[in-house]
Amino acid sequence: MRIINADGLILGRLASRVAKMLLEGEEVVIVNAEKAVITGNREVIFSKYKQRTGLRTLTNPRRGPFYPKRSDEIVRRTIRGMLPWKTDRGRKAFRRLKVYVGIPKEFQDKQLETIVEAHVSRLSRPKYVTVGEVAKFLGGKF
């Protein structure tokens, strides 16, 4: 089991690395999901996520698609988009993923990993928004 600290990691790069680990059969736990960052212009990011959460079918709005508002679910959905979700292999890989806001008690004394290639300090122009800020904008709790 790998425990990854998402604090200061770029969401897309984190998601692609984690998706690869899941497909290789590893169990992955991500902590501090609200501190992962999405790079780009703040207003563009907010408008993109706001538009996604408003998507519904005209015939029956209860049929989806459904996009999350909580920060841990935003990270899970991003990783799901990088897995072959419609196959049995992809669904089994997705079940091996756990994402938490903050650090739960059971993982506080464990060694946390980070992904150096995905850290925000490697950006030349640091324009970014945290996943927690996006979740607050969408009306999520965390």
Swiss-Prot record:
Highest rank taxon of the organism: Archaea
BP GO terms, sorted: negative regulation of translation; translation
PANTHER family: LARGE RIBOSOMAL SUBUNIT PROTEIN UL13 (PTHR11545:SF3), RIBOSOMAL PROTEIN L13 (PTHR11545)
Matching SUPFAM superfamilies: Ribosomal protein L13
Lineage: Archaea, Methanobacteriati, Methanobacteriota, Thermococci, Thermococcales
Recorded GO MF terms: mRNA binding; structural constituent of ribosome
Protein known as: Large ribosomal subunit protein uL13
Record's GO cellular component terms: cytosolic large ribosomal subunit
Keyword terms of this UniProt record: Ribonucleoprotein, Ribosomal protein
Function recorded in the entry: This protein is one of the early assembly proteins of the 50S ribosomal subunit, although it is not seen to bind rRNA by itself. It is important during the early stages of 50S assembly.
Family listed: Belongs to the universal ribosomal protein uL13 family.
Pfam family for this entry, one: Ribosomal_L13
Record note on quaternary structure: Part of the 50S ribosomal subunit.
